[in-house]
Amino acid sequence: MKNFALTGAGGYVAPRHLKAIKDTGNHLIAALDKHDSVGILDSYFPDCAFFTEYERFDRHLEKLLRRDEGKEIHYLSICAPNYLHDAHIRTALRVGADAL
């Protein structure tokens, strides 16, 4: 099983990614959206850490990497608007995750 993080959790594409992550037996560890989209996440991953601020999300991913508790992020699923993709790809690379 792999650990995922997701950006743009409240967007149009995110439910497809959430379903695929769940259907393949993987875990969503953290999610980001500037709007409160917990209702969408709860139906798939009720224990997922949810953030509305990018800085807090980024800090959380860094902490997961340093703690070495088996919760490091393997994949960052980017469902945010196109203009944010560059920053989110760089975040994925910095924490050792593959960007989707």
Where are these regions (language model features)?
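N-terminal Rossmann-like dinucleotide-binding module
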Residues: 1-49
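Beta-loop-alpha module in the N-terminal Rossmann-like domain of NAD(P)-dependent dehydrogenases
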Residues: 52-100
